[in-house]
Swiss-Prot record:
Cited SUPFAM superfamilies: ARM repeat
GO biological process: maturation of SSU-rRNA from tricistronic rRNA transcript (SSU-rRNA, 5.8S rRNA, LSU-rRNA); positive regulation of transcription by RNA polymerase I
Bilayer topology: Multi-pass membrane protein
InterPro entries, A to Z: ARM-like, ARM-type_fold, BP28_C_dom, HEAT_type_2, HEAT_Utp10/HEAT1, U3snoRNP10_N, UTP10
Subunit structure, as described in the record: Component of the ribosomal small subunit (SSU) processome.
Its biological purpose: Involved in nucleolar processing of pre-18S ribosomal RNA. Involved in ribosome biosynthesis.
Annotated protein name in UniProt: U3 small nucleolar RNA-associated protein 10
Gene that this polypeptide is encoded by: utp10
GO molecular function terms attached to this record: snoRNA binding
Source species taxonomy: Eukaryota, Fungi, Dikarya, Ascomycota, Pezizomycotina
Organism, as annotated: Aspergillus niger (strain ATCC MYA-4892 / CBS 513.88 / FGSC A1513)
Subcellular location: Nucleus, Nucleolus; Membrane
Keyword annotations from UniProtKB, A to Z: Membrane, Nucleus, Repeat, Ribonucleoprotein, Ribosome biogenesis, rRNA processing, Transmembrane, Transmembrane helix
Family: Belongs to the HEATR1/UTP10 family.
HEAT repeat start and end residues: 426-467, 581-619, 1043-1081, 1250-1288, 1294-1333, 1755-1793
Length: 1800
């Protein structure tokens, strides 16, 4: 019972929102997304609102939809809103607003303002607790971000099962991966439903965003796939049932999602789910249809592609190929659906969708009101979207639909025609014909019925016998059609065909009759009924035009083949029974058209009609029978028809047309060939036709042409024109003349009219345009003019397509027009092209000129216009005087002049573009005109101050093409006298255009090949220009230009100079100067290639030295130049490179001579603006030194020595010797000119660097025998330099080098030249370092000599320093082998060290050298340094430490090595012996000494410390006594107090290091000894000494307790009594005891702080220390002492309270402390201790610190404090009163309640 009640109470407590529980409320509102808990706890709602409102305002700027929330959840009033005080309705209303805001802000959560704004909802409205689901779902798309992790951390612990997936990640504080979320969506229906619900709600609110929708789509798609996969079962029924459950869950979501059309990503996500459903489950067709309708009904322009893909996948899963009507209509409404289907078919299966579209296209054929569906059907087959199998199925669907079309109603004639054409396409297409034939065979379709329904003939398909069912069906169809025909026949019985059916295009009566005729086709009975109609006047067929014209129009129109064949049959039947007294020549044009038809059946029937006409003419006895419909056939236009005499017609038919009847049937093109041959007066082979005479041909041609012109029907007209346009002329007339009226008529026809007449007869406007303009024959001399006259002058009424056709015809006939006519025609076109108004006429003329192949004469005529035009333009300018005085010499122009200038520019541009595009290389005769143009342009650009870059580029390009073609021939193809090289060079120099520059340079290069004598005198400015311009370019074309210029111009230039017997180097100096001057502007990656090409073309042997010298002279030691020079010499062989260097040195020598020669030309030596010869020489020599060092000469020489014969090797040695002599000669001659001398020395060094070490030493030995000491020193320095680098280490080199040592030792012992000795010692140093380890015995003697009087015993400072350093190197190399040389070395080196430290004679270099020597000894042979040596070193080191003339680094390094390497006992002993010397030397020496001790302790093992503890203790006690010693000296003290403090810090650090290496047993006696030393070790009368030792001791204890912490807390028992004593006498206000007091306070704080053993919790310890410690607060007598006491005593007291850790102890402390808070005597009458306000202030600070540190534990004593607080709140001192109020607020914050009631 009790436990149950307790549980209930705990639940109530957990859910309680007790308003009085301030602490709980503060915790509840301290959950934050952006602040940590500790910070959030301290913030009030005003602060939070201010921060969050700023973020909200920024959001409003981003999206105005946030603005309404400023009146609700972000209003000022919201700060006071508390959900716990709201009722259910208010909370529900708040939820609505909060969720609306969260939905809207979801897309901005990665922005800082949004996070701030949401934080307000969390802090004020606690949405993470009240709206948990909505909040989580808002943040869920960002599950990988730190923001989501922040949300997880503040979510309530009891998450609902919906989000149980988040629990483990909330606990472990890591972001959830994707997989668990998807798995939860798959298995947790509540989670998936929540995500779907949230996504749809946000989307309906139009607050959707990419992050949400991509997360939702991916999650839902994978979840559905997972659910379907997990539902798989071995039993199909079970699996189907589970799949249906999944589908039923998802369908409502899809339904809602697809309804939101404008949310594109949501809709596409639904498509993805539909695809998964279709792919992974077996859906019924009905459900798939529903999905397809939904998909098709949802797409927009943005989603249609995805929707189409989804539709194709869904269709693919259907068992029935048909698609729903709504889906079909949606596809049909798409813009270009076939193209879109084609785009997706490459990646997705579309076959079923395509079949569904085919089925939709042929559904309800009789009810289709337009041809849009049938157009789509045709496109599906034309684009080859269907595979072979699908194409067969589609054809079967079409054939079935057509076969049953008549059962549904009457098929319109247009639909019938369209389908007939499609079927014909099936039979004629190479790819579709086999499929169609197989489909016919497999589907058992009645071909005859199909042909009947479509009124067409299906060729090349075997006829199949219809099945019984088909026959029955046919009967049913027949009955339906008969009923239909009867009613239609009755409706047209009253129609009247007024005149010929050919008299007009639009005849309603004819349209009705032809529809009826189409229904009658196939039934003789119906046909009979139809032809008996009164409107046709069959009885008067030979005299009236109605009957025959009706059938003529029908068979020549765009109708089904069956209908046309039947029409021909009716004509044939009539002719077979007709009398021969009628002339039917009017039928001939239409029969010719029918004989050219693509259908063989039509051609066969037409041939029959032609044969019947031939029979009639044979039977005719009258010469001139009546011509049928002569005056009525075309209505009013009949009068213009040219008829043929009866006998002539008979001749024409019998001789020309009848012989080929069989061929017409077999070949549709045969009639065209026959007609062409007939009209040309020839006969086709094997045709049997005979040639007609000219009058007959003329009659026939004019007859046919007049019919073509006059007939109103465009279908036969177009076909007839195609036949006639094969014939240029006949019988003395041309088709241009005869068909001209039609061309005019067609030209004048308005666009909409032309479109209407062509659409009525299903012909293309473009086809008529093409045939109309083809009536103009190219054999007509005025063909171009005639064509042009049809569009010029231009009228806006002209149709653009007709204009285009005209110009296309011009292009087609241009090549056949005579050249002289081309010139005239081109002139006309050119004039029109330059008209101001931009019309299709102008554009067309320009296009013709650009498209046709213009002859040279035309182009030359155009070119000649340019100079003339420029001259004319200049004549319009102002007077010469005004022009000369105008600013910048510009031609002053009026607006009118500017317009003329613009016209001129356009004209010149057009001409030059025409020349450029007309393969100018094929017209070399243009060269003269182009050079004249170039001259005119060059003059003109100077007049108008314009670059004319484009025009110049075109001109130069054309010239370049001509010149390049001429280069390949033996002789120039044009007169070279017209070449103007000066103009080309001026183009290079005066233009800023890179294109012009490049073209001009290439032209110069080309001209230099075909006419060098005309070019070379102008070539130098070219290279000057190249240096300043072209060489700077970095594009590939410019690179090619430069290459060609160098390749072609330079060889010609060199050859020219040689022919003139001039020095080639001097002659090309300007060229070389141009290139070297351009170096810095040439792109870095191209420099080497360019200069290499230049040098190669000039000749490496002759020119390389000059190029190198000029580069070195101009750029000195520029790194890029040196790299280039190295690259240039690297490709040369060793002899060539050495020869180059020899010439280079000759040039240096020449530059230094009094009368410079070639150097004056190449380097400008001696010229007015030339550089100082000596500076030039220095630059050249330094560059040469660089080349010796960095080129591959050494490798090449070694290779040649190894592989080449004696001749090459001898050549190399000779050249090397010559170079050496040249260098030495320059050095000797310029010995007094230091820069040149040094530079020659550098060259010598680098030269020797090319030798192997053995060869080098051989050379040095020879040179050392010379008497020139300067040379000897120089070569030794070279040797040293060589050894400083990485010399050879092979065996031979090592032995040779060690064998060289005696030579050097001999120099040291015998030479009086100190500098030479110095160089020898330096060499010995290097040899010992590099090779000494190989054979130490060879080095020992050298070491003894260096240590002797002959070297470091000399008075010269330099030799001493070098010698000591050499000994250091030897010590390192030889190790113990060095011992024989040590006695002299140690004694002399210590003496030298002492000398280096003499006052006023300090020698830092010698000082450092000696310490380097001792460092080497300490490392390699430390046992050889005795105690006396160590004493000496230490004493001298103390002196060095205080000496200002030397550096500390080397000494410190040596002392550190002593501490590390020398025996530690010897080190400690030496320091102990010399401690007073260190102290006497001062703080720096003392610090260094302690540093040695510290390092020795650190680097040696524990055992060494324990073993030497006595001497170590001795050192430390001496060190600890430093403060007392300095105090005792009083004014004579050598250490400042700060120095003492610093050194004591070091001593404390050293002592701690020592303690770490000792155990307690070893250290405790030392500690007690130290305590005795500090407390009783000084006589009582020496108060100052005692204080000094105590200060030192307590400073140590401060570090001791602070560093070793709880390990040594127990040591406090040793000092507690002394501490109390110290606290009694030390005072922070007394300068003598202040340091002791501070050390004591800090020591106590460290001891209290690290007490883990309850040492200070013990009453015996606490009672002893508490009163003395708290009493220290009484030292706060003024502001300065109060600040010290508060800073030092209060922390110590606080730590003591923490360590005390019990209520009783706290009470005891508080009791003592409270006394200091009372300013007057208590009830007992005794002084309380708080009389001074500073004391009370300090006590208050202590209380504040204790309250902060201990919190509620300390405030358990609040009842005792309250009276004191009440008194203090009325204290006289303002500071005290202010602090007590702070304390009260602090108490209230901790307790969560106010103290007002308690204080009253």
């Amino acid at each position: 019972m009790a436990s149950s009640l307790a549980a209930q109470l705990s639940q109530i407590a957990a859910k309680s929102t007790n308003q009085l529980n301030l602490k709980a409320q503060r915790i509840a509102h301290s959950q934050s997304l952006i602040f940590d808990w500790k910070t959030a706890t301290t913030q009030d709602f005003d602060t939070v609102y201010q921060i969050c409102f700023e973020g909200f305002q920024e959001l409003c700027q981003l999206d105005p939809r946030f603005a309404p929330f400023e009146r609700t959840i972000f209003s000022e009033q919201s700060k006071a809103e508390d959900r716990t005080e709201m009722n259910a309705a208010q909370n529900k209303e708040l939820d609505t607003v909060v969720e609306a805001f969260l939905a809207l802000v979801g897309g901005h959560l990665l922005l800082s303002p949004a996070v701030k704004a949401v934080d307000w909802l969390i802090r004020r409205f606690r949405v993470h607790e009240y709206n948990t689901e909505f909040t989580i779902l808002t943040f869920l798309p960002y599950y990988t971000t730190p923001l989501f992790l922040n949300l997880l951390s503040i979510l309530p612990e009891d998450l609902t099962p919906t989000f149980k997936i988040l629990n483990p990640y909330k606990k472990s504080q890591i972001n959830p991966p994707r997989h668990p979320l998807v798995h939860s969506a798959t298995t947790n229906k509540h989670f998936l439903a929540a995500v779907n619900r949230y996504t749809l709600q946000v989307s309906k609110q139009r607050a959707h965003h990419h992050a949400l929708l991509s997360f939702w789509a991916g999650t839902l798609t994978e979840a559905v796939a997972g659910m379907l996969d997990s539902s798989r079962s071995g039993r199909r029924e079970v699996e189907k049932e589970k799949h249906e459950d999944v589908v039923m869950k998802v369908l409502p979501v899809l339904n809602d999602g697809l309804a939101l059309k404008d949310v594109s990503e949501l809709v596409i996500g639904c498509y993805m789910v539909c695809v998964v459903l279709a792919q992974k489950s077996s859906l019924q067709d009905k459900l798939l249809d529903g999905l397809m309708e939904a998909v098709a009904g949802s797409w927009t322009d943005e989603t249609k592609e995805s929707g189409l893909i989804c539709l194709s996948v869904l269709a693919q899963k259907k068992s029935d190929a048909r698609i729903p009507k709504r889906a079909f209509k949606a596809v049909l409404r798409l813009e270009d659906p076939v193209q879109q289907l084609s785009a997706i078919s490459a990646q997705y299966p579309t076959s079923h969708l395509l079949l569904g579209l085919v089925a939709g296209c042929v559904d309800d054929l009789s009810k289709q009101k337009d041809l849009s569906r049938l157009d789509l059907l045709s496109l599906l087959f034309e684009t080859n979207l269907l595979g072979e199998q699908e194409a067969g199925k589609a054809m079967a669907v079409i054939l079935q639909a057509v076969s049953h079309a008549h059962t549904e109603g009457v098929l319109s004639l247009d639909a019938q025609t369209h389908l007939a054409e499609l079927v014909q396409h099936f039979t004629q297409s190479e790819s579709l014909q086999p499929i169609f034939q197989k489909t016919i065979e497999d589907s058992s379709i009645d071909v005859a019925a199909l042909e009947h329904n479509l009124q067409t003939v299906i060729e090349s398909v075997p006829t199949t016998t219809p099945a019984i069912g088909d026959v029955e069906m046919e009967d049913v169809q027949q009955e339906a059609v008969e009923d239909n025909f009867a009613s239609v026949l009755e409706s047209v019985a009253g129609k009247n065909l007024e005149s010929s059916a050919l008299s007009a295009q639009s005849m309603p009566a004819y349209e009705s009759l032809v529809q009826t005729f189409a229904l009658a086709v196939g039934s003789q009975e119906k046909l009979q009924a139809f032809v008996d109609l009164p409107a046709l006047k069959k009885a008067d067929a030979s005299t009236s035009p109605q009957y025959l014209s009706f059938f003529i129009r029908t068979f020549s129109g765009s109708y089904p083949i069956g209908t046309r064949i039947t029409a021909l049959n009716q004509i044939s039947s009539l002719l077979n029974s007709a009398t021969p007294d009628v002339d039917l020549q009017a039928l001939l044009p239409f029969l010719l058209v029918a004989l050219a038809d693509s259908s063989e059946r039509v051609r066969r029937e037409a041939a029959g009609v032609l044969a019947a006409i031939g029979s009639l003419y044979k039977k005719s006895k009258k010469g001139d029978a009546n011509v049928w419909a002569r005056d009525t056939i075309y209505g009013k236009q009949s009068k213009n028809v040219q008829w043929i005499a009866g006998r002539d017609v008979q001749k024409i038919v019998e001789r020309a047309f009848l012989p080929g009847l069989e061929e017409y049937v077999l070949d549709q093109a045969h009639i065209g060939r026959v007609l062409e041959a007939t009209l040309r007066g020839s006969s086709t082979s094997d045709s049997g036709a005979t040639e007609l005479k000219k009058p007959l041909r003329l009659s026939l041609f004019t007859f046919l042409c007049s019919h073509a012109v006059q007939m109103p029907l465009y279908a036969p007209k177009l076909s007839l024109l195609k036949l006639l346009n094969r014939v240029d002329k006949a019988g003395g007339t041309t088709r241009t003349k005869e068909l001209g009226p039609f061309l005019k008529t067609w030209r004048d026809m308005k666009e909409h009219t032309a479109k209407d007449v062509c659409e009525r007869e299903r012909v293309s406007v473009a086809d008529v345009d093409r045939e109309a303009v083809m009536t103009v024959t190219p054999k007509d001399k005025d063909a171009i003019s005639l064509l042009l006259s049809n569009v010029s002058p231009y009228s806006d009424s002209l149709r653009p397509s007709f204009v285009t056709a005209i110009f296309n015809r011009m292009k087609a006939v241009w090549g056949t027009v005579a050249e002289e006519l081309q010139v005239d025609a081109a002139e006309k076109l050119f004039e029109i092209s330059l008209e101001d108004v931009q019309t299709p006429l102008v554009h067309g003329c320009r296009d013709v000129l650009r498209s046709v192949q213009l002859t040279g004469s035309v182009l030359l005529q155009f070119l000649r216009k340019i100079p003339v035009s420029i001259t004319d333009m200049e004549s319009l300018g102002p007077a010469p005087k005004r022009r000369r005085t105008s600013q910048n010499n510009m031609v002053a122009m009026t607006i009118k002049d500017e317009a003329k200038l613009s016209q001129l520019m356009e004209k010149m541009t057009f001409i030059l573009e025409l020349v450029d595009s007309s393969t100018p290389e094929a017209h070399p005769e243009l060269a003269d005109g182009l050079f004249q143009t170039l001259a005119a342009l060059h003059h003109f650009k100077s007049q108008i101050q314009s670059g004319l870059s484009y025009l110049l580029s075109l001109t130069l390009g054309s010239l370049l093409a001509i010149v390049n073609r001429s280069k390949g021939t033996a002789k120039a193809q044009f007169d070279t006298s017209v070449i103007r090289a000066d103009l080309v060079v001026d183009c290079v120099r005066t233009t800023d255009s890179p294109q012009v520059q490049n073209a001009a340079l290439l032209l110069v290069a080309g001209l230099s090949v075909i006419a060098p004598e005309l070019v070379l005198h102008s070539v130098m400015p070219i290279f000057t220009f190249m240096g300043s311009s072209v060489l700077r370019k970095d594009d590939e074309y410019s690179v090619s230009v430069i290459d060609q210029t160098i390749d072609q111009v330079v060889p010609a230039l060199i050859q020219s100079l040689r022919n003139q017997k001039r020095d080639v180097v001097s002659g090309t100096s300007e060229l070389l100067l141009s290139f070297t001057a351009a170096f810095e502007h040439i792109p870095s990656h191209r420099r080497l290639r360019l200069f290499h090409a230049l040098v190669t073309k000039l000749g490496t042997q002759d020119f390389l030295f000059a190029v190198l010298a000029m580069l070195a002279n101009r750029y000195a030691l520029d790194k890029d130049v040196l790299i280039l020079m190295t690259g240039l010499v690297s490709d040369a062989s060793a002899p060539v490179e050495l020869n180059t260097y020899s010439k280079f040195l000759d040039l240096v020598k020449d530059s230094l001579s009094s009368k410079p020669g070639i150097s004056q030309v190449l380097l400008g030596i001696g010229s007015d603006d030339g550089r100082d010869p000596q500076k030039v020489a220095v630059d050249l020599l330094r560059a040469l030194a660089y080349l010796f060092k960095h080129s591959s000469l050494k490798v090449k020489m070694a290779k040649d020595f190894a592989t080449e014969g004696d001749k090459v090797v001898g050549q190399i040695r000779t050249l090397f010797s010559r170079i050496l002599e040249q260098v030495l000669a320059i050095g000797e001659s310029m010995q007094n000119v230091k820069p040149v001398s040094q530079a020659s020395g550098d060259v010598l060094s680098a030269l020797f660097g090319t030798l192997s070490l053995v060869d080098f030493l051989d050379t040095i030995e020879v040179l050392l025998q010379r008497r020139n000491d300067e040379l000897r020193r120089k070569v030794l320095r070279l040797l040293e330099g060589r050894l400083r680098q990485n010399p050879e280490r092979d065996g031979a080199s090592q032995h040779r080098m060690l064998d060289f040592l005696p030579t050097l030792v001999n120099i040291i012992q015998s030479s009086p030249d100190i500098l030479l000795k110095h160089a020898a010692v330096a060499c010995i140093d290097r040899i010992a370092e590099k090779y000494g380890r190989k054979e130490p015995t060879k080095v020992i003697h050298a070491a003894q000599v260096v240590a002797s009087e002959a070297c470091i015993g000399q008075d010269d400072e330099r030799i001493r320093i070098m010698g000591v350093l050499c000994l250091a190197s030897m010590a390192e190399v030889l190790g113990e082998a060095m011992i024989p040389a040590l006695p002299d070395a140690l004694s002399r080196s210590l003496a030298l060290l002492e000398q280096s430290l003499e006052d006023g004679k300090e020698n830092a270099r010698l000082h450092d050298a000696v310490y380097s020597f001792f460092s080497a000894l300490f490392i390699h042979i430390p046992f050889m340094v005795s105690g006396s040596h160590l004493d000496k070193i230490l004493v001298l080191s103390y002196k060095s430490a205080v000496s200002e003339g030397v550096e500390d680094e080397s000494r410190e390094e040596a002392l550190q090595l002593m501490a590390r390497k020398v025996d530690v006992a010897a080190t400690y002993a030496a320091i102990d012996r010399n401690w007073q010397h260190a102290v006497k030397a001062g703080p720096d020496a003392t610090r260094e000494t302690l540093g040695v001790v510290s390092l020795a302790i650190e680097k040696h093992p524990k055992s060494a410390t324990v073993k030497n503890i006595a001497v170590l203790t001795s050192i430390l006690f001496k060190a600890f006594d430093l403060r007392r010693e300095q105090v005792s000296l009083d004014t004579q003290a050598t250490f400042e107090l700060s120095d003492v403090d610093e050194i004591e810090d070091i001593i404390n650090e050293v002592t701690i290091k020592m303690i770490y290496k000792l155990n307690d047993t070893t250290f405790r006696p030392i500690f007690t000894k130290l305590l005795e030393w500090a407390t009783t070790g000084v006589p009582k009368k020496d108060a100052r000494g005692s204080l000094a030792r105590l200060t030192t001791f307590y400073r140590f204890l401060q570090v001791f307790f602070g560093t070793l912490q709880s390990i040594v807390t127990g040591y406090s028992s040793y000092i507690i009594e002394n501490v109390v004593s110290v606290l009694g006498k030390a005072n922070p206000s007394n300068q003598d005891t202040k340091s002791l007091w501070l050390a004591t306070m800090r020591m106590l704080k460290n001891s209290f702080e690290h007490d883990q053993d309850e040492f200070w919790q013990s009453p015996s310890h606490l009672t002893v220390i508490a009163q003395p410690l708290i009493s220290q607060l009484a030292h706060a007598k003024n502001s300065s002492t109060a600040s010290i006491v508060i800073a030092e005593a209060v922390p110590a007291l606080t730590e003591l309270a923490v360590a005390a850790d019990s209520t009783d102890n706290h009470k005891e402390l508080n009791t003592v402390l409270m006394r200091l808070l009372r300013p007057s005597a208590g009830p007992s009458g005794k002084t309380a201790g708080g009389e001074n306000p500073h004391t009370r202030l300090a006590a208050l600070k202590a209380q504040q610190s204790l309250t902060e540190q201990l919190g509620e534990e300390w405030l358990a004593l609040l009842p005792e404090m309250l009276p004191y607080i009440s008194e203090l709140m009325e204290d006289e001192d303002e500071n005290v009163e202010r602090e007590v109020r702070k304390w009260v607020k602090q108490i209230e914050d901790v307790l969560g309640e106010r103290l007002d009631d308690m204080l009253t």
